[in-house]
């Protein structure tokens, strides 16, 4: 995932910051508790494609943060 892209992407619902989960290939919105999939390197920023994220899930500390 390109760091420049991570800096500008926001949650489509709340416009909040997203956190990259490298292991799961997802962008996590902690405010809405949603995880947006990344498919073939492309973030799918559609609410219908998001899944409920797991509270307290540990995100890869080596992954770049956009917060």
UniProtKB/Swiss-Prot annotation:
Listed InterPro entries: Trm112-like
SS bond list: none
Matches recorded under Pfam families: Trm112p
Domain of life: Bacteria
Signal sequence bounds: none
PANTHER family named among the record's database cross-references: PROTEIN PREY, MITOCHONDRIAL, ZGC:162634
Family: Belongs to the UPF0434 family.
Protein name: UPF0434 protein Reut_A0592
Organism ancestry: Bacteria, Pseudomonadati, Pseudomonadota, Betaproteobacteria, Burkholderiales
């Amino acid at each position: 995932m390109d760091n420049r892209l991570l800096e500008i992407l926001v949650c489509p619902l709340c416009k909040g910051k997203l956190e990259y989960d490298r292991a799961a290939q997802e962008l996590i919105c902690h405010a809405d508790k949603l995880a947006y999939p990344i498919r073939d390197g492309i973030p799918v920023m559609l609410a219908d494609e998001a899944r409920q994220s797991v509270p307290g899930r540990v995100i890869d500390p080596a992954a770049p943060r956009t917060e």
